[in-house]
Amino acid sequence: MMRLVRYCMGAAMFASACTPALKLTPSDAPTVLAHQVLEAADPGLPGPYEVLQLYYGSGTDKNRVEYRDSVAITTEPVDASKLVSLGGAADSRNEYWGFTPKEMPLNARVWYPKGDGPFPLVLVVHGNHSMRDFSDPGYDYLGELLASRGYILASVDENFINGARAENDARGWFLLKHLGEFEHFNEEEGNPFEGKVDMSNVALIGHSRGGEAVANAAAFNQLTHYPDDASLTFDFDFDIKGIVSIAPVDGQYLPTGRGVVVEDMSYLTFHGSHDGDVTSFHGLRIYDRLRFNDSGDFRFKAAVYVYRANHGQWNSVWGSGDIGPRSARTLDLRGLIPQVDQRRFAEIYVSSFMEVVLKGRQEYLPIFRDHRVIGQWLPSTMYITRFETNAFRPLATFEEDIDVTRGTEDGVSLRGVSLSTWREATLMLRSSNRPTTSASQENQAVTLGWNNRIAGADTTRHRPAASYSVELGGRLAARWALGRQHSLEFMLGPTDSTPRP
């Protein structure tokens, strides 16, 4: 007994000596989240509908009983051979799954409300993970919540392309094929979804590689041909109103060497500061590329950075192990917020997004403009947000040319006085998953520096005070019909460098 006690004490002392103190940024949550301004009902709570569940798929799955013996609707396989290449692993993968890319299944688990409908349709797709540790059950919490609030949610099975290379175009294409199935379900007499699917109100959610895949799907939805092989034709054109990217990658799929551009739909992305897999907020790149060309129907885009959230806890299967079974040896998991809190955040924001985009409930829009309006609902951590609507008109994005004095809109001029630093450059991400495609935010900004000390060798007291101005042309206000209801917005951030004298 004494040996055991001494051994345990020694182990405790060893662990204490080898484990550094946890370093976290002091939280402003007690102040920032102290108030509740929004008077709408909590969107993260279950709604009035009884939730039903079913599976659809091949009915022949070798590895999962739900897609073999439990399918309520049988679907036909699709030929994905132009989009999926298994390389040297083809034989072993085909043996494990029992099919090749020429006959890949359309499988999904569906949560839906009991009732006549029609109900808006939401698809969610996972990202890359061990193909044997099935990822599609991991969004059950979103399925249960959204179905109770009057949505049909299908968690799409794409485990059979996990571990393959250069497959993220296929990941998006599969989503569109699933939408085609729901269109058929809605029209087929005797189908459980007959007449219950509102195909005019569709949204997509993706996590990790799935977060980029929903952007690919949104782009493919408007195309007639596959960009990498025009012999594959597209005929989709579904009414996708919005997409959500959870901790997404970006740059896995680069058609013609360029990032995919999403157009004319609402967008939400969120990412955790303690993401141990996708270590930078790549969703900001999709956010910045997104274009609002049509000023008719209201649309918006929003981004939220969540302090102490990781990559895997958005999926109940993945959990805290962002880099696999050895995560606890490499990552300090003590700093993570609890999974229940991370999922609570996702429930609030995803549900609010669907309420605004698919049901037109504008009372939830302030959540995206300023998270502080729901301080009493949010988990106690820190958040950084961005927000923009299709009413936004840029004066200066610093993207168009190398002239630092010219703005984006005709007639806008930029002027600096007594600045020690004045340059335009590309913003960088905090880290790079892949140096060739992941180091840049793909977003330009102007960097300004000044020194207004009134004494010392580096004084500027003999010069005018430093200033930077954005000057609007004389007719711009009239051309844009500007009035008191409009506001001027600047996005500012400090740097860690010191300006020159």
Where are these regions (language model features)?
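Alpha/beta-hydrolase-fold serine-hydrolase catalytic core, especially in secreted/extracellular enzymes
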Residues: L22-A29, Q36-P43, R308-H311, V317-G474, ...
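Short amphipathic alpha-helix adjacent to the substrate-entry channel of hydrolases
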Residues: F134-A154
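Short beta-strand element of the alpha/beta-hydrolase
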Residues: P118-G127
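Active-site-adjacent alpha-helix of alpha/beta-hydrolase-fold enzymes
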Residues: V260-Q339
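A conserved short beta-strand
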Residues: H225-P248
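Gly/Ser-rich "nucleophile elbow"/oxyanion-hole loop immediately N-terminal to the catalytic nucleophile
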Residues: G115-G117, A166-E212, F220
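Hydrolases whose catalytic domains are alpha/beta-hydrolase-1, hotdog thioesterase
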Residues: A213-A217, V278
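Short conserved active-site loop signatures built around small residues
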Residues: L22-G117
